[in-house]
């Protein structure tokens, strides 16, 4: 894991300056944000983002759509400017990172990078764990530089268990493995 959380700090003044440097006045920019209705945390996050964009003068029109519409039009059809959705990882990091491959059917970001494509291919053909870890580190750093998606939050998970529960492992992703779980009397 490479901590890239501080790559882009919240700085409205810097955002305005960057827009100006790129030849935009913020008032000229309008985006639509399509959010899946059935996921309140995504709707809430989207509304916060729209508000933050408004503070630098960018108009963001929020459209809340049914989950089936989001899947069909945003995820599959890629008809959107902005969206908010959650992604869960897997124990093998390439399962999540491979969606950034140029040819991936899950690449609804429409991201394309020869560097990332090469690192994904190298990872998949590599047996050396240290080299695989280096490939993952480089993919994460490239994604932090290119910003095809901006990860903004990680929901807190709370687990309650009987004191006799043994073998339960809490992962930082939505994976629950119960093969070693036992309840002692």
Which residue stretches match the model-derived regions?
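Periplasmic binding protein-like
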Residues: 51-101, 135-136
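Bilobed periplasmic-binding protein-like "clamshell/Venus-flytrap" ligand-binding domains
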Residues: 22-41, 82-86, 127-163
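Hydrophobic alpha-helix feature that most strongly marks membrane-spanning transmembrane helices
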Residues: 54, 58, 75, 88, ...
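Short, solvent-exposed loop/beta-turn-alpha elements that line the ligand-binding surface or hinge
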Residues: 1-13, 24-27, 74-79, 95-125, ...
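Append "and occasionally in soluble cytosolic enzymes with long acidic Gly/Pro-rich linkers
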Residues: 1-51, 131, 138, 184
């Amino acid at each position: 894991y490479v901590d890239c959380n501080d790559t882009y700090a919240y700085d409205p003044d810097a955002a305005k300056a960057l827009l100006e440097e790129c030849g935009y006045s913020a008032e000229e920019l309008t985006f639509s944000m399509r959010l899946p209705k059935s996921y309140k945390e995504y709707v809430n996050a989207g509304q916060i983002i729209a508000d933050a964009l408004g503070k630098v003068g960018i108009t963001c029109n929020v459209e809340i759509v049914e989950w089936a519409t989001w899947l069909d039009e945003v995820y599959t059809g890629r008809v959107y400017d902005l969206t908010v959705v959650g992604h869960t990882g897997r124990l093998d990091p390439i399962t999540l990172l491979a969606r950034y491959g140029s040819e991936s059917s899950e690449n609804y970001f429409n991201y394309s990078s020869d560097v990332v494509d090469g690192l994904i291919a190298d990872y998949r053909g590599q047996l050396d764990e240290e080299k695989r870890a280096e490939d993952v580190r480089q993919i994460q750093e490239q994604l932090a530089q290119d910003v095809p998606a901006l990860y903004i939050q990680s929901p807190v998970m709370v687990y309650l268990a009987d004191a006799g529960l043994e073998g339960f492992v809490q992962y930082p992703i939505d994976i629950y493995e119960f093969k070693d779980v036992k309840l002692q009397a």
